[in-house]
Each structure stands twice: as C-alpha cells, then as structure tokens.
Amino acid sequence: MIKPPLPLAQAAHWMTSFINPNNHALDGGRATSALELETIGALGSMVGYSKPLGHLTSGGTTANLEALWVARQSNTNTIVLANEHAHYTHSRMSEVLGIPFQAISSTENGAMNLLILRDVLEKLQCKGIKATIVATLGTTGMGAVDPLADILPTARAYGARIHVDAAYGGYFTLADLSKEVQRHFTAMDSADSIVIDPHKHGLQPYGCGAVLFKNPEEGRFYKHDSPYTYFTSDQLHLGEITLECSRAGAAAAALWATQQKFPYVRSGNFAQRLNESLEAAQGLKNTLIAQGWWVLEPELDICVFSLSGLKASEISAKNRMFFEQKAEENIHLALFSLSQQNCPWEMEWDVSSLTVVRSVLMKPEHNDPALWERIARI
C-alpha cells in the first residue's frame, strides 16, 4: 500500500525541511501552522464537516489513538466495537487506553454485520454501557465498506459514539463509487470523528495522517499547559489540541501544496486519479472471471481472488503456490485469509480458513489491461 507521492508534495516537503519547522507551537512553525489549519479545513469540507477541530499526525495509528482517547475522555464507561476486519490498530490502541474492545462479525462481503451489532448494543444497554463504534470505510484486507449510513441511526438509538476509520478509503468520497457505497461515504458528515491518511491516497510522502472531530468543543479534552511553549501568542497553538508534541511542519507544507494543485472536488483531476484505481480493480476482476477465477466484488480498489477447487486446504495451497510463482515474475501480490462466513464459493471446509490472493491497485500504472492479463495468467 505505497502510492508514489506527488512530485510537488516531495518538493514542498524537501524545501520546508531546510527550515525544519515544528508545528507544536507558533514560534516553532508560524507559517506551516497556518498551512496545517488550511489543510484540515479542506479535509473537513471534503467529508462534510463545516468547522472541524483537527490536526495532522504521523499516520493513522496515532490519529485513531487520539480519536479513541477523546471517546474515552467523553465517556469513561465505554467499549470499542469494530468490524472483525478493522485495522488491528483499534484493538491495540484500546489496550493502550484501557478500553474494552469487542470485534463484531462481518457479512459475506467483509462489512460489519448490522444485526449482530444491534444485538451487542442491546446487551450493552442493559448493562448501562454506551459504546464507541468504529466504522471502517475501506478495510485494509478486503477494501470492504462498513454500512455507515445504516449504523448511524442504530448507534444513536443506543447513545453510541461513532468514529470513522477512513485512513485508507476516505478520499474515495470524491470518486465515482457505486450508489450503495457512496451512500455510506456521504454519511461521514454525521460521525463524531474521522481519520484519513493523506499518505495513502492523498499523494503524500510518509508520514501524514489526520484526525478530525465534528464538534470543536471536544478540544477541551486536550486542555493542558506547558512551561516551555504557548506563551508567545494568544492565538491557538496546534500543540494545544494534539497528543503528539513535536510534529514536522514539512508535512503540512507538502499537503497544502498538493491541495492547491489538486483541490478536493468531485470530477476534478484528483478524483480522476481515484477513478482510475476503481477502474483498475474492476478491470482485473473481469479479467480474472473470464479466466475462471473466483473473485470478490471490489468496493474500492482492492481485489481479492482465488483459484477454484474442491477443498479449502487444497485451494489454499494452490493460491500460495501461485503467489510465489508471480513473485518470481516480478508481479508482487499479497495473501489474505477468509473465514467461511466471508467466502461465497462452494467447497469442502476441511480447514478453518481459506488463503486467497489480494491485489491493491492504487498506482496509475495498475490501470492497464496488459498487467491484468499478466496477473491472471496461471
């Protein structure tokens, strides 16, 4: 999952690094702090937040940590509920924060099972516990999209908080998604917090993540004093609303420059790059199906597929052999495990999971029929 950064972003990052600004306090990065606030405004507008509180982070792990920390600060008697395919960050950060964590089973397409979620919320309500629900828009393994638009009314009925992990998929809200998938992306504006990684599909060098809060009043949870900083100005110092202290201003400069070149608008040049990734996933899917492969329907730009067969163990072995064969051909794929509930194909389940092949089509050169043929060729 490494997308080439925009050369403009690399140049802005490189040039800014010569003055080495620190966006913790205004006296360490006055210009880049202003740029960071602009980048957060642009990200907020993209997801439908009118006046978001937020900042850049080193990546999605820290961004999700902060979102879960604010959730805990707003309700100390909470539990984190997330799709079983959610990024492992959530279970790890819940452990760090001392918050109970529970994985929610998924449906066949890898999205959170709404019926099971509702049952869990009902049981928690009987115990007087209000949950923090993590809805993932683009799981790392399958690119699955949790049904956010349907989770929201259920969550509100039980007094639950909603955090959206759109670290991988967030930018796709600008793309030409299917009507059903777009419905869930459009619902992001009703979430309490959102995480997006500009260093995934935002054309940024590593590391650049972002956390956004819909309610600016939640900045009160960050309130602290510092004997070393914050005394040079009555203006907001970004360090006052972050858990991280020192943060490179170069990341803000790079993202700001990219946003000037490619504004976040539907049907714009930036959105077209995302559409090419969607087209690549569909193109690979169709090529694989034509050659007899089993393929899951891609919701974003991640394609999961498998050779056919009779037994899960035999199919898994064939898929692993195919993976190794392609690596020798300089076609670098990945492996993933599917449980029976996530697998629509008929077979004998003589083992507990099926090893399948996974391809992330996030680079411009992936939208190429010749490449799809090379991947599908056995």
Where are these regions (language model features)?
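A generic structural motif
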Residues: 108, 139, 261-263, 308-311, ...
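Active-site C-terminal subdomain of aminotransferase-like
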Residues: 177-178, 184-299
